[in-house]
Amino acid sequence: MSVKLMMTWDIAPEREQDYFEFVIGEFIPGVQRLGFQPVEAWATIYGDYPQIQVGILAEDLPGVQQVLRSDGWIQMQDKLLALVKNFSYKVVPARNGFQF
């Protein structure tokens, strides 16, 4: 069964330019190389919710767990964590439409 890796975070103040360069230049291509398929990205413009939410599609739960333990993922996550705060993730069964 397909699953989604749902991630949320807030962009760290004063790091916006570095953040966007990293996401476009490294993060998106990196998750694709690891076998994930980015399917959605949302930005919160009002309210007390995470600023960014990203949904990444994966084939199955064991595959996600394996990638999340890989050196490639850990290195990318470390770079992301230097640019964001309040990072959180969960793996949920994939379905169409908005998931939170």
Describe these PLM feature segments.
Residues 41-44:
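Short, solvent-exposed loop/turn elements at beta->coil junctions and helix N-caps
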Residues 10-22:
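Short, surface-exposed ligand-recognition loops at beta-strand->loop->(often short) alpha-helix junctions
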Residues 3-10:
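Active-site-flanking beta-strand signature of metal-NTP-handling nucleotidyl enzymes
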Residues 92-100:
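Short, low-order "capping/linker" segments at domain edges
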Residues 24-39, 57-92:
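An amphipathic, aromatic/His-enriched active-site/gating alpha helix that lines ligand/cofactor pockets
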